[in-house]
Swiss-Prot record:
Cell wall formation. Adds enolpyruvyl to UDP-N-acetylglucosamine. This is UDP-N-acetylglucosamine 1-carboxyvinyltransferase. It catalyses: phosphoenolpyruvate + UDP-N-acetyl-alpha-D-glucosamine = UDP-N-acetyl-3-O-(1-carboxyvinyl)-alpha-D-glucosamine + phosphate. Pathway: Cell wall biogenesis; peptidoglycan biosynthesis. It is found in: Cytoplasm. CDD domains: UdpNAET. It comes from the Bacteria. It comes from Chlamydia abortus (strain DSM 27085 / S26/3) (Chlamydophila abortus). The keyword Cell division applies. Keywords: Cell cycle, Cell division, Cell shape, Cell wall biogenesis/degradation, Cytoplasm, Peptidoglycan synthesis, Transferase. It is an enzyme of class 2 (transferase). Its main location: cytoplasm. Its EC number is 2.5.1.7. The keyword Endoplasmic reticulum does not apply.
Length: 444
């Protein structure tokens, strides 16, 4: 396992380029399996989840050429050679579950995918996926090792209402509907920018697909596809992460390729606590503007709300903001466990099982620590921490950048490689002092 020695007391200054979005690239690669035509993706980040998805597609029959220097992937899947996804992809991330929709579209006689993995931030149940696929005519079963699905009569368009605007379920049902007979309507769909990027990609491929502001997506089944050349949107999570690190350390960083329209809720909240930013045609400059002011209620939500993946790094900012602030996590029920690591560093925060905001969320009656109060300002001290998940990992790195009393040892940093391209070199180029280490697993 990997680890990093992170020295505190640095001020981040300079320029950094944000990469293509992880959560878009991986889904577009899966979407390419729907077509037997060539697809070209540009602005592709060389990160763990993308590498894994490429290998997954290759295992199914895709021909992939990846020019990593040019950040371009050319993928062509004239035939699906295997409709059973190898167990080697079990429990590593959540991409395999999307293959139920994509592979059923081309192999309705039956597909098998392994159990999913990903960040340990809650149950993230798959019921919405399975119920929607069954409405399209599929039969789905779980045997303890993976999921089997078949559509003996083929997939048939349907009217589907999701109980919650789940991103993964929306993506899966879109993929399954592309080759289904007739029209499919998905109500209460997620409309994250990565889903809109997927819709744009499918339109280029010849699919008749539209979306409305009332969370409705309409898809007409398609059999003939076009070649696609598509530019992946910039990663709004990476852009915000570097922006927060700049403000936290009292620095000034220009994030090239950051796009304002993808980050409106984040930028609003950052400004509300005193963080500075300036938008240009080529990116966004983030800077320390004034002492940070707390007293805010930060409630995560589906788009267009405050993104759950922004929440963890933002909590470090709140630990350095004057006053008490509230976090109410409404997307994932078990995402606040990382705060115990910040407490170890000296952050003054409390976890709560009830909803601490003006409205109750779907976890109000569950026994989940999904709210927190963070009291600032509290100095942070260097510590040894183990990263529990991807975004908590960046939060720990941020905290270590301002920690007093020697370097922090942050373990499990390989999780950061899943979503942040070249993160050590990028931060060090801005003035951070981070050394990667390789530790004996026994040390964990």
């Amino acid at each position: 396992m990997a680890a990093a020695e992170v020295f505190g007391g640095c001020v981040l200054e300079g320029s950094v380029r944000v990469s293509g979005a992880k959560n878009s690239t991986t889904k577009l690669l899966v979407a390419s399996l729907l077509s037997d035509r060539k697809c070209v993706l540009r602005n592709v980040p060389d990160i763990g989840d993308v590498r894994l998805t490429v290998e997954l597609c290759r295992s199914l029959g895709s021909i992939v050429h990846w020019d990593k220097q040019a950040e371009v992937i050319e993928i062509h899947t004239p035939e699906i050679h295997m409709s059973e996804v190898s167990a080697q992809f079990s429990r590593v991330n959540r991409i395999p579950i999307l293959l139920l929709g994509a592979l059923l579209a081309r192999c309705p006689e039956g597909v098998v995918v392994p159990c999913v993995g990903g960040d340990a931030i809650g149950e993230r149940t798959l019921n919405f996926h399975f119920e929607g696929l069954e409405q399209l005519g599929a039969k789905v079963a779980y045997d303890g090792h993976g999921y089997q699905a078949a559509a003996p009569k083929g997939l048939i368009g349907a009217y589907i209402t999701l109980p919650y605007p789940s991103v993964g379920a929306t993506e899966n049902l879109i993929l399954a509907s592309v080759r289904a007979q007739g029209r499919t309507i998905i109500k209460n769909a997620a409309l994250e920018v990565e889903i809109l990027d997927l819709i744009l990609f499918l339109q280029k491929a010849g699919v008749e697909i539209t979306t409305d502001n009332d969370r409705t997506i309409e898809i007409f089944g398609c059999e003939d596809f076009y070649e696609v050349d598509h530019w992946v949107i910039p990663d709004k999570i990476e852009a915000a992460s570097f922006g927060m690190a700049a403000v936290l350390t009292g620095g000034r960083v220009f994030v090239e390729n950051a796009e304002q329209h993808l980050m409106i809720p984040f930028l609003k909240t950052l400004r509300s606590i005193g963080g500075g930013f300036s938008v240009t045609e080529t990116g966004i400059e983030f800077f320390y503007n004034e002492p940070l002011k707390g007293g805010v209620v930060l409630e995560t939500d589906v788009h267009p709300g405050f993104l759950t993946d922004w929440q963890q790094p933002f909590s470090v900012l709140l630990s350095q903001a004057e006053g008490s602030s509230v976090i109410h996590e409404t997307v994932h029920e078990n995402r606040l466990g990382y705060l115990r690591g910040l407490q170890k560093m000296g952050a003054n925060c409390e976890l709560f099982y009830q909803c601490l905001s003006s409205k109750a969320c779907r976890y109000a009656t569950g026994n989940f620590p999904h709210s927190a109060i963070i009291h600032g300002v509290t100095p942070l001290k260097a510590s040894q921490l183990v990263i529990p998940d991807l975004r908590a990992g960046f939060a720990y790195i941020m905290a270590a950048l301002i920690a007093e009393g020697g370097p922090s040892l942050i373990k499990n940093t390989q999780l950061l490689d899943r979503g942040y391209y070249n993160w050590v070199d990028k931060l060090n180029s801005l003035g951070a002092k981070i050394h990667l280490l390789s530790l004996d697993p026994v040390a964990f």
